[in-house]
């Protein structure tokens, strides 16, 4: 859609040293079609083929890019499966986050209060089909049916809001499935959550998981590309099947085994993040 409507846009008159398409799709198309620069860089954040991108829709825009960065090894493999001829100029560039800022802001007051009773689950991300919140509704219902006192908090806006709210009402768990919308500071919620759940249909490399690890969360994630590079199953989290039963079973394991949850929290907090290589990649493009 963006490629169609951008065809009539004017080319920016000024020439830049470096133009960066921060994400696949609209950003990449705009940089290719309308920005003049000595060098161009594109970032890929998602499993390219599963996200619906094709060579036909791209119109080979990436041929014009000097470097393509993917956020994980698996994302790189998926992109190269679509563009094998671009392998030489495709490199991995891991997400950069500010750990000190995240830890500092996690002590601030929450905009919305979380329940003091039962188990607090948290998921952060846009309300889209990819993120799998519809399956989360059914997983929560299974947990409630199994007798667990659980509240699931969702931070994020998106096109699925009304559909998810209606589904929660239909399944009778709307008092426990809390669609809080986007908040300026999500970090106190990570800190207060008992378990962070990231059960998505497909993924690139999740910044939300990185943030949860910085704040020492016990994490459950679906076993898909991206998540597999961030979670070592059984060591610092659980990789679960992307079904209501699979997600519910993973959550139950942590609820009924507090020692395991503690182990995962400690392992998450101990993860070391080094951004030096990523920064050198960007600096190298400006030489």
Annotated model-derived regions:
Residues 74, 96:
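Carbohydrate-associated surface elements
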Residues 119-142, 148, 159-165:
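A conserved mid-protein helix/loop that constitutes part of the nucleotide-sugar donor-binding site
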Residues 182, 201:
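Aromatic "clamp/platform" in nucleotide-sugar-dependent glycosyltransferases that forms part
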Residues 211, 223-234, 238-239:
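Short acidic/histidine- and often glycine-rich active-site loop of Leloir-type glycosyltransferases
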Residues 218-221:
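Short hydrophobic beta-strand element within catalytic cores of glycosyltransferases
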Residues 233-234, 238-245, 253-258:
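Conserved acidic donor-binding segment of nucleotide-sugar-dependent glycosyltransferases
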Residues 246, 260-274:
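A short, well-ordered alpha-helix in the C-terminal region of glycosyltransferases
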Residues 272-287:
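C-terminal alpha-helical cap of glycosyltransferases
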């Amino acid at each position: 859609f963006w490629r169609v409507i951008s065809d009539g846009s004017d080319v920016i008159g000024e020439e830049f040293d470096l133009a960066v398409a921060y994400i696949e799709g609209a950003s990449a198309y705009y940089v290719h079609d309308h920005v003049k620069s000595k060098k161009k860089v594109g970032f890929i954040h998602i499993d390219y083929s599963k996200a619906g991108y094709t060579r036909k829709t791209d119109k080979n825009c990436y041929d014009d890019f000097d470097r393509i960065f993917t956020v994980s090894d698996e994302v790189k493999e998926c992109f190269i499966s679509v563009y094998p001829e671009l392998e030489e100029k495709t490199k991995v560039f891991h997400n950069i986050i500010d750990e000190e800022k995240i830890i500092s802001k996690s002590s601030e007051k929450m905009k919305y209060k979380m329940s003091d009773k039962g188990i607090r689950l948290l998921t952060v991300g846009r309300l889209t089909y990819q993120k799998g919140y519809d399956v989360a509704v059914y997983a929560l219902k299974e947990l409630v049916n199994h007798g667990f006192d659980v509240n699931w908090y969702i931070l994020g806006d998106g096109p699925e809001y009304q559909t998810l709210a209606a589904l929660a009402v239909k399944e009778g768990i709307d008092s426990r499935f809390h669609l809080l919308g986007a908040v300026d500071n999500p970090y106190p919620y990570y800190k207060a959550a008992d378990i962070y759940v990231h059960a998505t249909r497909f993924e690139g490399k999740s910044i939300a998981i990185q943030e949860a690890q910085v704040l020492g969360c016990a994490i459950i994630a679906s076993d898909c590309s991206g998540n597999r590079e961030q979670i070592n199953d059984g060591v610092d989290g659980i990789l679960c099947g992307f079904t209501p039963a699979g997600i519910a079973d993973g959550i139950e394991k942590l609820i009924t085994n507090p020692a395991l949850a503690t182990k995962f929290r400690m392992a998450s907090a101990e993860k070391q993040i080094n951004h030096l290589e990523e920064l050198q990649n960007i600096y190298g493009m400006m030489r």
